[in-house]
UniProtKB/Swiss-Prot annotation:
NCBIfam families: PRK06076.1-2, PRK06076.1-5
Name of this protein: NAD(P)H-quinone oxidoreductase subunit 1
EC numbers on record: 7.1.1.-
Keywords carried by this UniProt record: Membrane, NAD, NADP, Plastoquinone, Quinone, Thylakoid, Translocase, Transmembrane, Transmembrane helix
Enzyme class (EC, first level): translocase
Taxonomic lineage of the native organism: Bacteria, Bacillati, Cyanobacteriota, Cyanophyceae, Nostocales
Catalytic activity: a plastoquinone + NADH + (n+1) H(+)(in) = a plastoquinol + NAD(+) + n H(+)(out); a plastoquinone + NADPH + (n+1) H(+)(in) = a plastoquinol + NADP(+) + n H(+)(out)
GO cellular component: plasma membrane-derived thylakoid membrane
Gene expressing this chain: ndhA
Subcellular location: Cellular thylakoid membrane
Function: NDH-1 shuttles electrons from an unknown electron donor, via FMN and iron-sulfur (Fe-S) centers, to quinones in the respiratory and/or the photosynthetic chain. The immediate electron acceptor for the enzyme in this species is believed to be plastoquinone. Couples the redox reaction to proton translocation, and thus conserves the redox energy in a proton gradient.
Membrane-protein topology: Multi-pass membrane protein
Organism superkingdom: Bacteria
Amino acid sequence: MNSGIDLQGTFIKSLIDLGIPPGTAKAIWMPLPMILMLIGATVGVLVCVWLERKISAAAQQRIGPEYIGPLGLLAPVADGLKLVFKEDIVPAQADPWLFTLGPILVVLPVFLSYLIVPFGQNIVITNVGTGIFLWIALSSIQPIGLLMAGYSSNNKYSLLGGLRAAAQSISYEIPLALSVLAIVMMSNSLSTVDIVNQQSDYGILGWNIWRQPLGFMIFWIAALAECERLPFDLPEAEEELVAGYQTEYSGMKFALFYLSSYVNLILSALLVAVLYLGGWDFPIPINVLANLVGVSEANPVLQVVSAALGITMTLVKAYFLVFIAILLRWTVPRVRIDQLLDLGWKFLLPVGLVNLLLTAALKLAFPVAFGG
């Protein structure tokens, strides 16, 4: 198996070669992954917002952003700057502490979840053995922030939106976790890196989507509900609740909700790519490519090309799923709250349990194909 390029080791070694003490070199490296994560997630959101506006315009036979930068690429930046410089208003009867804490509790867990997303063999901020468990734990914090935002606003629409958001998030977390448990069972690991490695032996034929089509559908539907994307955007349904739990928010606090929504969408797409679509894995195994060009897998140039290909493949897979999510916004009608809860509790939950039991049975019956 290709061990990948060791970015941390290479960076620290380069600094040591320049005469910097090893301790100082390690200290310089420590904040870099977090800074890169924040920059990468923010740029990803800007790209996602631009795509949403252009795809939405195309779906409605419009042009969309056109004049703010080439092809309107700077329109999301203009939107962000506008929100940053807007006045931050706190309603007179609101609870100021909870009102401020709500958006922070919503956006922080989403950013922290990026810690376990691998873009390559060694291109991951923290490869912890319980990465999937960490992500599930972090995602369960978000409903608390949504409830805080809805309750503290002292507004009936905000409260209803917060209650809807919490109910929706809790309802779909369980099917989401069940679909992931089936993947964990096949991979014998909670590490996202191990899960991708388990899919890398046979190229595109080794991807988990072929062995877990049911789990893939459950995960994708539940992820859309967690991100509050149409047809599951009931917490902020404009026709019913003005803007839901965001009704009383303005300025930077509103921007945090806006940011959280898109960061969560990209995170969900990345996790689908990692868990079901082989992550950074190229459809043709790297050892086959190495044999075709007649070089060793340990060749430094091949390692760099492999790392670049890995990042590209992960992002291509993720943004294809983002494209599907945006397209769904204009093709599927919004469901009612009772339909949404029925889908989560009466359909996805039982199907998720059956899928988990079926995976366990297939693992015992066909250990080679299902990771026995």
